[in-house]
């Protein structure tokens, strides 16, 4: 991934893409058209019901539900694996059920959970953060989408788990605090499973009829089948073509691929992102270490964003305009 780059788009190129990047977000009166489409895609009555509620009514309803994860000194919570869905040759969706089917996760936007596993021969437990892809207000369970890495002890353990086994969780781990209309335009540069915290924010925006934030996504993967959550992203892009645009990059594109290949480059970012001087924008970055190094520079620690370097610095963005997950 991110080895070479040529950007060939089937959409109107050049000036049309630049226009999208620079124009203000339209102000539609409602997100209702999305609700039905996503409800059908999800196949759940609750999924549809909760989108018909006003944000205030939904918030009040959620306050009445018990939360599985409350942070602080709560400690680890063991959840049972209830289902496994194979998404590709090395990616699976794992559903973990809550002890109480009416409880919700207690996560907020944007936040993650820690997972813990200690094998019989391990001296120390393996602890890794994951961002659930299920709704924060979904009662009864949470879903993780996990790619198995050859030398990844937690991802390998998850892929070897059987239904009925348990995994320890802890959280929520706060990331970027999101509020509706906090920014006029957000831009997301993601690689591989780095899409999961991005999708958490994207979903929150388009589930809220009062949030008019515009979203641009640049998403790199190795192959087309590695593009996680593509179905959900397509629904959003088709429903909100003036508020959500996704640009995909593949290291190994199939025949007939019409979008980008290889590296995220300065040329691409200059074309699809709003100019640095644009007011009230935010750029989010999440992906493998090589992508951080090239695009934004790495974080110093989970709580220290580090200095802004790489392509975004070269293009003139400042540190306050960028957040690294």
Curated annotation (Swiss-Prot):
Keywords: FAD, Flavoprotein, Membrane, Mitochondrion, Mitochondrion outer membrane, NAD, Oxidoreductase, Transmembrane, Transmembrane helix
Main enzyme class: oxidoreductase
PROSITE patterns in UniProt: FAD_FR
GO MF annotations in UniProt: cytochrome-b5 reductase activity, acting on NAD(P)H
GO biological process terms held by the UniProt record: ergosterol biosynthetic process
Main location, first listed in the record: mitochondrion
Catalytically driven reaction(s): 2 Fe(III)-[cytochrome b5] + NADH = 2 Fe(II)-[cytochrome b5] + NAD(+) + H(+)
Membrane topology annotation: Single-pass membrane protein
PANTHER family: NADH-CYTOCHROME B5 REDUCTASE (PTHR19370), NADH-CYTOCHROME B5 REDUCTASE 2 (PTHR19370:SF171)
UniProt protein name: NADH-cytochrome b5 reductase 2
Organism: Coccidioides immitis (strain RS) (Valley fever fungus)
